[in-house]
Amino acid sequence: MREVSDPLDLIKEWTVRDDDVEFVSGSHERRRLGLLLLLKFFEIHARFPSNLEEVPDGVVDFVARQAALDAMSLESYEWDGRTIKRDRAQVRDFLGFRECTVAEADLLVEWLVGNVAASERSFDRVKAALVGRCRSERIELPASGRLDRMVRSALSQAEDAAIATVARLVPDNVAERLHALVDDDIDDSSGELSTLGWLKSTPGNVSLETMLVEIDKLRRVREIGLPAGVLDSVPSALLVEWRRTVGVESPSHLRRRTAESRVALLGTLLQARERELTDTLVDLFIATVHRINARADRKVTKELVEAFKRVTGKENLLFAIATAAVDAPDEPVRDVIFPAVKGGEVTLRELVYEFKSKGPVYAQTVRATLRASYTNHYRRGLIELLDVLEFDSNNSMHRPVIDALELVKTFKDSRVRFFPDDAEVPVHRGIVGNWASLVFNNDLPERRVVRTVYEICTFQALREQLRCKEVWVHGADRWRNPDDDLPADFDERRVEHYTALRQPLDATEFIDTLKAEMDAALSALNDDIAGCDWIDIADRGKQGPIKLSPLDAVTEPSSLRALKADVGRRWGTIPMIDMLKEAVLRSGCLDQITSTASRDGISPDTLVERLLLVIYAYGTNTGIAAIAGGEHGHSDNDLRYVRRRYLTNDIAQAIAVEIANATFAARDPEVWGAGSSVVASDSTHFRAFDQNIFTEWHARYGGRGVLIYWHVERKSMAIHSQLISCSASEVAAMIEGAIRHSTDMAVEGNYVDSHGQTEIGFGITRLLGFDLLPRIKRINHVKLYRPGPKRPGDYSNIADAMSRPIQWGQIAEQYDQMIRYATAIRTGTASTEAILRRFMRSNAQHPTYQAMIETGRAQKTVFVARYLRDRQLQRSVNDGLHVVESWNRGNSVFFYGKGGDIASNRRDEQELSVLCLRILQTSLVYINTLLIQDTLADDRWSRRLTDADRRGLTPLFWSHVAPYGEVRLNMARRLDIT
């Protein structure tokens, strides 16, 4: 028998009512308890138990006591035969249910097909919908096997119906071109990709060649001519499934499908690839324009540095030159000036180089070099880009750049130096300022516009406006119309969205609350600062007004070292594969797996073993080929097949989430304390292959690679991971993980370092309803804003750190729009990074940006005022970040293969490696949690740990784990854990 986990559930589900007793009173005394159990079980599950083993422990006695029946009478109850059939019929009649006939089963499947199975593709959720439908229709649930067959039938029929609809909408000539995509496979002799493989391939590194290849791909996709809207009727969940399926199938696999299925899958691929390629080209454009500028800057700097030697004593030098010139004004320079200077001509040349290396001459030289680089190399790709991308803007202020692009396209093949006099040249902010002297030629009688320089300035202006999404691209996804990022139903569901964010509908109420918090925090700091010997606020000029003493170092308690040693003695050295196996078997996380293919010829036990090995191969970065040689009986091809068909990134994410949830459920509060609602997040750098547009140079880490952004809670369990580029916003990554981690944890606060906080970040997190708790590196320069106008005597003890009042009027005016953006992040209508692009400094004049900044400044003031006077908060932030830093140290221990480099240029492969590493480390934390609890249950440890020991207790250690060596997977060998 299973157990009832919660006593409240026992009371809620198995309480006997008076009418229940009356219902069984007419039956023979020996049948009453069995009949009553059938009744209560059916009320809970809408089906009957097949035997007594399905009834939870403790239920029989609980029910018998309530009904004043003898529990022993159940021993004579027959669970098979005419009696129980009669009892079941009685229960159905009493509750108003009926058996599920063949006709009703067909109707249920038909209902699933029309209402659920197309938009929801999860087997478990479709099954739950079927169970709910049976209850509402008062139909007894079919047997488990029959129920599963009904669900599978509904999923299949819904997909077939969608496929048929798409196939009807695709013209015959387009269908022929789609079929032609799978006519060829990889050429084994040359190794060249098939046409389909080429279209699915990822872009190379940022270069002109990559840009031209991606342009060719986009043109090839568009040449097929898939009609617009042909897939609009297909639910997004089914499109995601089709996209995943066609992504892993080769041309030969697709050829074995029906023609209709092939058209639907390939059409889905082309629609998705058109958006992806458009996004990629925008990324390449932004990176290329930046590269042109950066390389010109480096080239000029290198040339000048090589010739540069700083000249000292310039005042004396100037005096000597002036004296010589005045004394002999008519003599040649070489005869008068050179001899007057120590070092002669050489010194004067060095002075010229020094002047050129800074100021306007240097900038002018950089711009000239940039022009040459653009004209001689990059122009070809950037101009061709204009033929395949359509730019647009919703803001009339930025229309001149769009008009300028049309002018550039008009003269793209022209060789003239200047635009013709009759050409209408749009004036935009990219051609004014420092570039004006190069854009406009003033040597001619009439001022003329230099065409190539104008193109450069236009592309630079376009880049800046794309980055903040003031200019957007038709047919893109990440770079689409920013209005599409916002929830379309916001106006109709405004109250619901405000309630979900726990924000008031009235802007005045929001402002009054925030203003009161500011005043309370500032007043508390002002009143308490005299007693806080760790903080001093005074005017220190450039050093900043705030002086905060560092926290005292805390050493690891000796008892914790002894505890870890005891764990090692009791269980010995545990191979990492066994830690993973134990976590998977105990958590049941592989129950979440659904295949990306339709056929399943692998037994569940074999599938579990192969998945464990693939996860281990990716998580350790050793690779499948290395793991295939271990003691487990699975070949390289077997493992690669399972990887391709079963282990998607979504499934790996679900596995990690299930292990985290299992850890939370297994924790003993007496050991670990109450659950926390605060996480810490930080990034760490991984070197990675760089023949892709995602890998970037990171100045702080000094190498090319990617960043992994982790969210880890106080007891060392990672709840979220993200693979981001080195230039990505860590604030966006922080918000994304805090609200979309999918675990059972409710996040109410987030510790970050300086890279994870900005004033925009403070504003967004305030609206989203959780606290941003940063460790600010340059806290000495932080300014505290006033909640209202300055008055004599206000905050006099902290006056040197005070700044201007918050502009509450801007917040009130843009409050609803800010809530709209926060709702977009909460509901996921667009990625957090896409939303936050609207709040970049280059878009500082946007009114919503200004309002968000003011909100962030107010919230940051509240936090900093609390932080400065609360030593415990400082330590909590520091301890939380120490946990995520310890997690980062573990990365190098377990991700040891190939020198720790992510050895793939494919984004999905890189993400899977990170997810599998997360699975390994969450498995370690899960099993260590159980090992520690078992160890502390020993009488020797019952009173040994102090409060300080318990605060420092962590399951993130690996002194007893063997991450290296031959992989020996034995599913029968289990760890002896309670």
What are these regions (language model features)?
Residues 2-518:
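Long amphipathic alpha-helical coiled-coil/heptad-repeat bundle
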Residues 20, 565, 597, 604-613, ...:
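Glycine- and acidic
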Residues 34-35, 56-57, 619-630, 636:
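Short, charged amphipathic recognition helices of the HTH superfamily
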Residues 46, 624-627, 679-685, 734, ...:
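Short, conserved catalytic/metal-binding motifs centered on acidic residues
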Residues 73, 77, 629-667, 671, ...:
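Catalytic or ion-translocation cores adjacent to nucleophile or general acid/base/metal-coordination motifs
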Residues 520-630:
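Structured, charged N-terminal subsegments at the starts of enzyme catalytic cores
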Residues 685-696:
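Flexible, glycine/threonine-enriched loop-and-boundary segments that flank and lead into catalytic domains
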Residues 800-978:
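Long, compositionally biased intrinsically disordered regions
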